């Protein structure tokens, strides 16, 4: 239990940050799933468009340090390779 005013405030901030970060992580996972679903359908145009949107989401989440920049690069690289493999 937080005893000082500062500790109580930090506890409140932590709860709010956790909600916000969870929302961003969920948005990231959803964007990645949408690209994978588009790849599964085999439509390169739709997959390319969803990849563009997902790349934006991945970069935003990485910029906010929700995920590491290398993890973001890995996600983008693998998704782009999968979209490129569609012929």
From Swiss-Prot:
Name a single GO cellular component: small ribosomal subunit
| Annotated GO biological process | translation
Do you know which Gene3D superfamilies this protein is assigned to? Ribosomal protein S20 (1.20.58.110)
Which region ranges are annotated with the description Disordered?
A: 1-24
Q: Which UniProt keywords apply?
A: Ribonucleoprotein, Ribosomal protein, RNA-binding, rRNA-binding
**One example GO MF annotation:** small ribosomal subunit rRNA binding
Give the family this protein belongs to, as stated in its UniProt record. Answer: Belongs to the bacterial ribosomal protein bS20 family.
Biological role stated in the UniProt entry: Binds directly to 16S ribosomal RNA.
Question: What protein am I looking at?
Answer: Small ribosomal subunit protein bS20
> Source species, please?
Bordetella avium (strain 197N)
């Amino acid at each position: 239990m937080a005893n000082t005013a500062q500790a109580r405030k930090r506890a409140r901030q932590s709860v709010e940050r956790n909600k916000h970060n969870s929302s961003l992580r969920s948005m990231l996972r959803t964007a990645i799933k949408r690209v994978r679903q588009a790849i599964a359908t085999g439509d390169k145009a739709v997959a390319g468009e969803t990849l563009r949107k997902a790349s934006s989401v991945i970069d935003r989440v990485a910029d906010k340090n929700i995920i590491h920049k290398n993890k973001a690069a890995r996600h983008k690289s693998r998704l782009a390779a999968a979209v490129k493999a569609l012929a």
